[in-house]
Each structure stands twice: as C-alpha cells, then as structure tokens.
Amino acid sequence: PVVAQDGPPDIRFGAVEAFRDPVAAAEAGVGWDRILFYWSELQPNGPEEWNGYHVPDVWLNLAAEHGRQVVGLLKHTPAWATDGPVGCGVPRGLDLPVDDPANLWANLIRRVIGVYAGRIDHWIIWNEPDIAPPTYGYEWCGSMEEYYRLLKVACMAAHQVSPDITIHLAGMTTWHDETYLRRFLAFATQDPSGSEHGYYFDVVSLHIYFRTESVPEIINETQATLAAYGLNKPVWVNETNAPPNSDPQWPMEEANYEISLEEQASFLLQSFALALSAGAERVAVYKWLDNDLPPGFEPFGLIRADYSRRPAYDAYRLITTHYAGTVSAREDRYPLHTLVTLDRGALTTRVLWARTQAEATVTVPALASQARLIDQAGAEQTIESAGGQYMVTLPGARCADARGCIIGGPTYLLVEEAAGAPPATATSVPAPRETPIVTTTVAITAETSVALPTASPIPTETPTETPTAIVLPTETPTATPTSTPTPTATPSPTPTATVTPVPPSPAPTPAPSPVVSLPAGLGMQSVLIVLVSLVASAVVFGVWFRRVNGR
C-alpha cells in the first residue's frame, strides 16, 4: 500500500511526471502533477481516432486518491493535422472560426476537455514557444502571432465545453528570448475582443534552471511585464531544477554546468523558498524520475531510472513538510547569506544559506525559546535561544561552476512553533549589520480561478507592432561556456527520508555541519577587550617616546 504524508498535500508544490513513481510521490506529499498529452498520440491517424491509453486512467486515479491535482500540457501536431513539420507545425484551419469543423485544433480541444472535464481542469497550451527553430529544443514552428491564435482558439473552444477550465500560457524559458512575453502581450492587448476574455489565458508559466537567484529575478520581471500591460495574472514556476553532473550512477563526460548531488538538493530548497517570497502561486520540480534518459543527457530526476533516490528527493520532502501552509514569505538577501522567512501560522520556518564561498555566521531573532535546526538531508537538532536570538554558522558555497556561485551553500531550516514574522531580520556577524541588499515580502492568498465568458465568434485579428513606449528591465542571460570534463566526485550516501533527531556531529556530506553558538557573557568580554587594548596602547606609546628623546 502507498503511505502518504499526514494530511492532504499543499497543492502549491508539484513535480513533473510524478505519476512515474506514485509511491514516492505520495510519501513526499506532491501537490500537483504535470502530464504531457501529445496530440500525435491521442489521434495518431485522424480526427475520428482516440487513443485513451496514451494517458492511462490509473495515473489520474492514483493522483486523485492521494490529493494530487493533475495539470495537462497539450502539444505535438500529428502529420495529418498540419501542412508544416510534424510535431511543431501550425494546426491546419487554425485561422478559421472556432466553430468551423475544419478548425482541427478547436475540434481537438473540445474533445480533450470533454473527456477529462472534472479530472483535469488546468491546461497548458503547448511548450516553450520562445525557442525558435532551429535552436535545440524548439517545439513550435509557428510565429508568435500564430501562437496567440493557438492560445485563443484553445481558450474559446475549452469554454464552450466547460466554463471552469483554467488556461495556462506555455512555459517560457526566458533566456532564449527575453522579450517574447513583452511582444506577446503587446500583440494580445491589441485584440479588440481580448480584454473581456482576459486575453485568453489565466496563468503565466515559467521554466527556470541552474541559478538560484534567477528564480525571484525572473518572477519579478514577469510580474512587472504583466503590470505594464495592466494585467495581474498568477505566475507559476512549472519547471525548476539544477541537474547534477557528478552522480557516479550517471557519469557525464561533458556537462554545461558543474553541479553536485548535494547542490541539486540545495537548489530545490533555495529556489522553492525564493519563489514563494517572490509571489509565485505554485512551483514544480522538473522532473520526478529519469525515465528513458539517453546517454550523456543531464539527469534531472529526483529519482533515478532504477528508482533509487538522489539527495534532492529528501530535500523535496523537507519542502512539502516545512514550507507547507505558508501564508506570507519574506526574502532578506545579504552580501554573505540569504534568509527566507516563511510565516506558516502556528509555525515559522527560516531557510538559510551562504551566498559565497565564505562561511557566514548569522544571528537570527528568536520567536520562541528553542527551535529545530534541520540540515538538507533531514537530520535535526534542537537549539536554545539566548538573548532573544540564535547564532548559526553556515558553510560556504562550493562555487565550482565557471559562472561563480550559481547555487548557495548547504541549506538549513530553522523551525519554530511560533506565529508571526520575526521582530527583526537576521544579520551576518561581524558584518554587515545594516539593512539587507534585497528585501521582498509577499502575502500569499488562496488561488482564485476566474471563469471566462462563453465563447463568441472570433473577430479577425490584425497584427500590430509592439508598443515602443514600454521599456521594462530584462535580465541578460549568461552565455553557456564550453563544456569541461567533469571532475571525479564521490558523493555521500543518500540519507533516509525519515527525519530523526541526532546530536550535533559532522554531516555525512563534504560540507560541515552548522556551528551553533549561543551568546553569553558579552558584557565581561567587552570590558576585558577594552582593558587589554589600553595596556597595549600605553606600551607602544612608551617605546615611541623613548626613541624620540634618544633614550
């Protein structure tokens, strides 16, 4: 039998293709699952065909049984339905009215919504249209304007069947085409019928990888772009991860990034916390399990193809356990460390890590007399507060990638049974004690799903140029350097997922355990330091005076 975590999972935390190991998904408390629906598999030979075995009902039934919401992603045009390339070609008849039988895409949407209504009510329309052919990974061969038409027809046809369907923009990589979303919105907002239909989408989807601090930066930039066009849409991070290149069970001779197994685990803890603090409505890891992984490809899975679990799986369990129920989140970023505070009502979780190779000794305001300090493998100890604070030394980051410290150091959770935000922010010791260089706070509200009006005849769109008056900041991506040979690395054994109290001891990873120090006797120490300093100054002055007077 599948043993799930106590209580229903927090729906905000998801995993792509969690159905591939439903036992592990239930144990880890996965809240939502993204499943690919290939049009070319559903109807491989013609519009009258329907292959229900493409996505077996058992996947959907197990998800429902364990409280996982399923989000569908539709893509991949069959040969019979396009005049363009198979897979990425624009569907035939897309420019026809949504009710025209020759609009093959509209027909598919109505069929899909009818089959899965009540079981899948969130649909992502295609994948990564911002990757232009022939760039590796491209999936859409149409123009940006044609993608808007694809989205619009999908939304109109879906709401003909069910007004409760939520339509998502395709996940965007951002760094392939930084201005894609801005140009898309500029075009969409020129559609005369768009405003009353929310421009035919409810949610913006993002794919963010490798660099921890890119997560809040891209979310904030996306929110600013939406606001520039008068829109306030939820933002989901549908894919995020930092795949390791040093797993001895999946060696890679060349890799684009230098990332250890432990850094993959750190990345998840950091990126999920930062996504919450930036206001993301949901976050999901790509992906759950490495199925059919070709040799030399990056192993994104939290679970290997043989069902053994990487350290990142244990980190994910910490997320679903200690981030669940967050009602507000705050990021305080300092030169040497980052602190994310998650207000969970009766509980408060602080997520801490070093940003550079240097150790960071951090004082954290206490909300209670004691707290649980948990490392990223799940080992924990109880620490006592003194003088209204805790003091923790965070190990420095590995920073082995050519781009620098793309992932912070080993990540620690400080969990207190106390409600409310802390009275003050954490600081590094001895410096800086000033305000953090970045502070972001968001209140997290329950998801709302806006039902769009019933579809109406679609007006003819006239493409317009992107407005030049709106200039928004963009993040310049770092170019990927030439791959270098992967250094030999012997990772630590994957710890068990059960959190067990342990006495303070060196962690089983190359990074040291945090040094927990409690301030005591600070007044007497200060007096002694002053006296010693005065005596030393007097001695130095005496020597100088004797030399000046020739004695």
Predicted region positions:
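Ser/Thr-rich, Proline-interspersed low-complexity disordered segments
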Residues: 2-8, 421-518
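N-terminal substrate-binding region of glycoside hydrolase catalytic domains
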Residues: 3-113, 117-125, 130-139
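Active-site cleft segment of glycoside hydrolase catalytic domains centered on the general acid/base Glu
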Residues: 85-201, 207-224, 246-270, 299-306
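Aromatic/acidic polysaccharide-binding cleft in carbohydrate-active enzymes
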Residues: 245-316, 332-334
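Carbohydrate-binding surface patches
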Residues: 332-371, 376-377, 417
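C-terminal beta-strand-rich structural cap/linker in extracellular carbohydrate-active enzymes
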Residues: 384-426
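Juxtamembrane/start-of-transmembrane alpha-helix segments at the extracytoplasmic/lumenal side
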Residues: 515-532
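C-terminal membrane-anchoring or membrane-association module
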Residues: 528-551
